[in-house]
Amino acid sequence: FLGITLQYEMCYTNILQVLELSEIPLRAADRSDNDPIVIGGGPCTYNPEPIAPFFDLFYMGEGEVIYDQLLDLYLAHKEAGGDRSSFLKKAAALPGIYVPSLYEPRYREDGTLSSFEPLCPEAPASVRRLVMSVLDRADFIDTPLVPFIRVTQDRSVLELMRGCIRG
């Protein structure tokens, strides 16, 4: 797996750079069984469509609620000799997991989303976000890995525009 946190829309181009530098095909449709499953999570997954072609799946809401089940599913699937596409179909059946390749978004002339059609029975008609109601039950890393280097520590974010330009 390659997990990417989507904190800000302005960081989307960095995702492409990470994939390119890792020699992972940019588009999920071009990946083989030998490539990692690219997973998106974080606040920007509430509007995943602009970057959906680059991700195999998204956690909708808080991934801590479901990631153990997803990992167990993956391990069992690999042990059984399953392929990438069948794993993604099984993953889509888990609550809070959105697999873009299993849906056909349709847009209006103005570019807004008009409908969202599942392409297979495993894909639910809608994907509901997951919320961890009691944070005390969550597993957290005691000592997160954050590189102590200038490029990481000496930076700031400047947001020039906020909100949707389409009203």
Where are these regions (language model features)?
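Glycine-rich beta-alpha loop elements in corrinoid/cobalamin-binding modules
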Residues: 1-119
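N-terminal [4Fe-4S]-dependent radical SAM core
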Residues: 111-160
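Local cysteine-cluster metal-coordination motifs and their immediate loop/turn environment
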Residues: 159-167
